[in-house]
Every structure is written in structure tokens, then in C-alpha cells.
A protein has these predicted regions:
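Alpha-amylase-like alpha-glycosidases and glucanotransferases acting on alpha-linked glucans and related
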Residues: 1, 18-167
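Conserved, well-ordered alpha-helix/loop/beta-strand core segments that scaffold catalytic motifs
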Residues: 1-18
């Protein structure tokens, strides 16, 4: 409130993926692709590119988007609603993961053996916009391997992207 009263907007940051040992994953196991013992079956990362011959193996468990869809994305809505009580705009790290994400079998030592998997994209952001009842105050971190479908998703919802001068 103090910053807003001074004409300053705050930009928050939210990663798309959760750490495997986070309370979010532990308390909401059905929302993630985990086995019966709670271990990930697939994990997040990015494919090989000109920065890394083996890609990036982040190791975060991936979402069970079917379950999220069944709940109307309730977990995500709560997460974003709360974050927006702390800031005016929210930068989503790895926005491209809402269009397609790189799924790597759990236990791999590199990201080479991953594959692109479709994410809910338009359905997710349509639900988010309808539920929150206003234009989304989201900044899409659209760096890295970005294809036309990621740009179309970003533009469909009027979300600003990012440019890093160094690149």
C-alpha cells in the first residue's frame, strides 16, 4: 500500500514449478505426477540448446494437469490470488511451460531424453481470467526456446513478455 500510495507498482515473481520437497507438493500430491511412494515419475527441465549440449535438468515434479483441470485450477487460482495480495504484477517464470513443457523421466542424469508435452495453455488462462474477473496482471517470462504457439498464447491474453538486452 505504501508503494502504491507513492505511485510505485510492485512486480512479484512466481516460478511455474514447485520443488519436490516443498509443502505444496507434499500436501497436494494428486496435483503432481508422482508415484505411489511420492517420487516424481517425470521432472522439469529444458532440452539441449546452444547454451547446454545436455539441456537443463531442473528436477521439479511436473503437474498432473488433468487433475488441475478437474478442480478448475483451484490450487493455481489460490496461489496467484495470494501472490497478488503482495504485488501489483506477477512475472511467471518459465511461461512457456503453460503451452508445452519438457518432461524428463525421473532418474535421468541429463535432460537429453525428455520430450515436449502439451500443457493446458489457453484453457488455463481463460479460467484464470474468468475467475479473477479482470485482465491478468501477469508478465510472461518468455525467454529461451520460444515457438509460435508460446507467442500466440502470450498475445491472446495481452500479456507483456520480456527482453534481456544481453541476448
Amino acid at each position: 500500500k505504501y508503494a502504491n500510495d507513492k505511485g510505485i507498482s510492485i512486480v512479484g515473481d512466481i516460478p511455474i514449478f514447485m520443488a519436490w520437497d516443498s509443502v505444496d507438493v507434499w500436501a497436494n500430491q494428486s496435483l503432481f505426477q508422482l508415484d505411489s511412494k511420492g517420487y516424481p515419475t517425470v521432472v522439469a527441465g529444458v532440452p539441449p540448446d546452444y547454451f547446454s549440449a545436455t539441456g537443463q535438468l531442473w528436477g521439479n515434479p511436473l503437474y498432473n494437469w488433468k487433475k488441475h483441470t478437474e478442480t478448475g485450477y483451484e490450487w493455481w487460482l489460490n496461489r496467484i490470488r495470494y501472490q497478488l495480495t503482495l504485488c501489483d504484477f506477477l512475472r511467471i517464470d518459465h511461461f512457456r511451460g503453460f503451452d508445452k513443457y519438457w518432461a524428463i523421466p525421473y532418474g535421468e542424469e541429463t535432460a537429453i531424453n525428455g520430450k515436449w508435452v502439451e500443457a493446458p495453455g489457453v484453457n488455463f488462462f481463460t479460467q484464470l481470467e474468468a475467475t479473477l474477473g479482470y485482465h491478468l496482471p501477469i508478465i510472461a517470462e518468455d525467454l529461451g526456446e520460444i515457438d509460435d504457439s508460446v507467442i500466440e498464447l502470450r498475445d491472446k491474453f495481452g500479456l507483456p513478455g520480456m527482453k534481456v538486452l544481453e541476448f
